[in-house]
């Protein structure tokens, strides 16, 4: 397995402390990788800064061609990437290969096209004898911090728009799931000029802090927890860096009495438990109107009970393990606290799986109240709660009564209600009669403590640029 860092176009071994990388399906150590040293972090940033002088002045066509080549090489090595993602994350292999790899390739191809469509405003005379124009220019060096739930996908979301806009990037994947990012580094080094892409390995304290705090870094992009976002914002405040934050969610799923119950059950069974629930948009916080509450709980419980956990290389496996032992304990603790309330009922699941690996049974909890921790706090596991509600006004208030603001969905046959409720929800994305659908052309991002900035779409590309005014006297 490729375990070297990419610094200034060269694959080099880390010079810091070695860290184990695990297979969460077995609990075994896959390999140990040496972290980047402080000197290597500095070298990577300085290489990116030096490369920016030329890369930032390339034409959109040149940048697009590089991104298209990278998309092609990922597609050609799709099986290799899927196997690495499966072994390092515990994802079902068929899901990694059939769902994630095509989406990752599409992200790079989309931004290759978007790079050639990014424009400033046309020139105009707003002062006599002077012509003004608006430019959208790259920022410089971007430090990108990717999470452990979708390592390669999130690397793509961060690399593609930053590079398309003309920035240079230093990427740090999670130390828990670094293997696909390191493999990507190996393939990218022969496509992009030296220093344009740099990939490091290490923990937040030893590598993330010196990277994000480096004076040559002009922007920090993070997908991670609220706590990590707070830390980076505080850590970088003195240097006034631009920050781009996607900090998780607790998606409300509002099910009205007139909803298609079978569609809701199928949707939540899939989108509440995909990737073992380790998804910031997971359909995990259901509000069911009282007229259909009992029916929904019964049917959804039966459906969730049929979800199959198993070995990632088994074609019939629907749920793999959680990413780490520490995360398994966090999820287990959250469910035990919910059970201890006395009013929350475990419909199915509610326990760790026996045997090796970090498996937790797909869980449905009924009778949760608005103020319960299981409703208010992100669990980030295969755990869905159901809360009954009376009317539209109440459920909109409850849905918005959250520190999160990333994703939401509304299930109803009433078109007017769908529009009315969607307009009032304080979430970056609202789906109607579906959930979890993402496309490269549409923006993904949140509000409130879920963060700010957009991934994907032309809005995502603009986030990696600075607006400049140029005035010419004539």
Swiss-Prot record:
NAD(+) binds at residues 146-148, 172-175, 209, 225-228, 280. The active site is at residues 246, 280. Pathway: Amine and polyamine degradation; putrescine degradation; 4-aminobutanoate from 4-aminobutanal: step 1/1; Amino-acid degradation. It is an enzyme of class 1 (oxidoreductase). GO terms for biological process: L-lysine catabolic process; putrescine catabolic process. SUPFAM superfamilies: ALDH-like (SSF53720). Keywords: NAD, Oxidoreductase. One of its GO terms (molecular function) is NAD binding. Homotetramer. HAMAP family: Aldedh_Prr. Catalyzes the oxidation 4-aminobutanal (gamma-aminobutyraldehyde) to 4-aminobutanoate (gamma-aminobutyrate or GABA). This is the second step in one of two pathways for putrescine degradation, where putrescine is converted into 4-aminobutanoate via 4-aminobutanal. Also functions as a 5-aminopentanal dehydrogenase in a a L-lysine degradation pathway to succinate that proceeds via cadaverine, glutarate and L-2-hydroxyglutarate. This is Gamma-aminobutyraldehyde dehydrogenase. It comes from Escherichia coli O139:H28 (strain E24377A / ETEC). The lineage of its organism: Bacteria, Pseudomonadati, Pseudomonadota, Gammaproteobacteria, Enterobacterales. The gene is patD.
């Amino acid at each position: 397995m490729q375990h070297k860092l990419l610094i200034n176009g060269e694959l080099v071994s880390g010079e810091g402390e070695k860290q184990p990388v695990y297979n969460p399906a077995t609990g075994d150590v896959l390999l140990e990788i040496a972290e980047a040293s402080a000197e290597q972090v500095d070298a990577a940033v300085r290489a990116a800064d030096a490369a920016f002088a030329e890369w930032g002045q390339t034409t959109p066509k040149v940048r697009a061609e590089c991104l298209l080549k990278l998309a092609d090489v990922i597609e050609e090595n799709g099986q290799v990437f899927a196997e690495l993602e499966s072994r390092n994350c515990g994802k079902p292999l068929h899901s990694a290969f059939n769902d994630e790899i095509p989406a990752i390739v599409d992200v790079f191809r989309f931004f290759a096209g978007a790079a050639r469509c990014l424009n400033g405003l046309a020139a105009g005379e707003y002062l006599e004898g002077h012509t003004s124009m608006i430019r959208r220019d790259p920022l410089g060096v971007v430090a990108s911090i990717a999470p452990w739930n979708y390592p390669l996908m999130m690397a793509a979301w961060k690399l593609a728009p930053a590079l398309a806009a003309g920035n240079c990037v230093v990427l740090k994947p999670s130390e828990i799931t670094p293997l696909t990012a390191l493999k990507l580094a190996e393939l990218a080094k022969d496509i992009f000029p030296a220093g344009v892409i740099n990939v490091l390995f290490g923990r937040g304290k030893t590598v993330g802090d010196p990277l994000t705090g480096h004076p040559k870094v002009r922007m920090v992009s993070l997908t991670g927890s609220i706590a990590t976002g707070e830390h980076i914002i505080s850590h970088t405040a003195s240097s006034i860096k631009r920050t781009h934050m996607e900090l998780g969610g607790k998606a409300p799923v509002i099910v009205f009495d007139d909803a298609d119950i079978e569609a809701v059950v199928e949707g939540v069974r899939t989108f509440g438990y995909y990737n073992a629930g380790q998804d910031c948009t997971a359909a995990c916080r259901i509000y069911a109107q009282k007229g259909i509450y009992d029916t929904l709980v019964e049917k959804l419980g039966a459906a969730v009970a049929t979800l199959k956990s198993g070995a990632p290389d088994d074609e019939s496996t629907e749920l793999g393990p959680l990413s780490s032992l520490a995360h398994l304990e966090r999820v287990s603790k959250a469910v035990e606290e919910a059970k201890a309330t006395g009013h929350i009922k475990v419909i199915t699941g509610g326990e760790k799986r026996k045997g090796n690996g970090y498996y937790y049974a797909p869980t449905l909890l009924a009778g949760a109240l608005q103020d319960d921790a299981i409703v208010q706090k992100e669990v980030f596991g295969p755990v869905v709660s159901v809360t009954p509600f009376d009317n539209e006004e109440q459920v909109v208030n409850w849905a918005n009564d959250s520190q999160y603001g990333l994703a939401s969905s509304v299930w109803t046959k009433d078109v007017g209600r769908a529009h009315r409720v969607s307009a009032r929800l304080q979430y970056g994305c609202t789906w109607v009669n579906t959930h979890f659908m993402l496309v490269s052309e549409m923006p993904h991002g949140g509000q409130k403590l879920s963060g700010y900035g957009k991934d994907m779409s032309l809005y995502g590309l603009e986030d990696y640029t600075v607006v400049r005014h140029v005035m010419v006297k004539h």
